[in-house]
Amino acid sequence: MSTTTTVSAIRTVEEMSNITISSHPVVNEQIAILRDRSLKPSQVRSVVDEISRFLAYESTKTLKSPSVSIVPVLRSGMSMMSAFSKVLPDVPIYHIGIFREKSTLQPIEYYNKLPKKSTDTAVILDPVMATGGTANAVITTLQEWGCKNIIFVSVLASEQALTRFSNIPGVEFVIGAVDKSLDAKGYLVPGVGDIGDRLYGATA
């Protein structure tokens, strides 16, 4: 019964015009591996890189503007950089640092290295989109910067967050897979845990 509900929910998200969810079997397989909490940090980084390689091709296949930047969200967005810099080797890379305050779940920006002049298109990298708070903060920052087209790429996202951003003009989402639920701490269920800690072997 729960499987049917989850599939139905994902189909609803897939119908949103600005959201693309990968159907590639390798992406699905690698996300299933990523859910294994016993993986070592080096294995987590390898799996995220492999998924990112497929998402990089998917998210850039319709790029038209020569004015493009890559914006990884520190710290976990850096894990997707290698794959995207191979597909877009000569575009500038700008960094935005945001962390989610644990008690309020609100995003707090602590680093912003955007230049004065914006690019027409920005590809944002953040492997997990849970509540959507961080995504909203980064999108708002880039829009205020003057960026007209935003492509937000995540390995895993919640249905709640994607529904929040449905049909926003100038913003597209390319997602590896969707989880339906969030727990009380704002983590995806079943999710992949704290992806930043898992990537770098840190503890909360």
From Swiss-Prot:
Taxonomic lineage of the native organism: Eukaryota, Fungi, Dikarya, Ascomycota, Taphrinomycotina
Domain of life: Eukaryota
Protein name: Putative uracil phosphoribosyltransferase urg2
Positions that bind uracil: 188, 193-195
Cofactor list: Mg(2+)
Enzyme Commission designation: 2.4.2.9
Organism: Schizosaccharomyces pombe (strain 972 / ATCC 24843)
Binding-site residues, D-ribose 5-phosphate: 187
Location(s) in or outside the cell: Cytoplasm; Nucleus
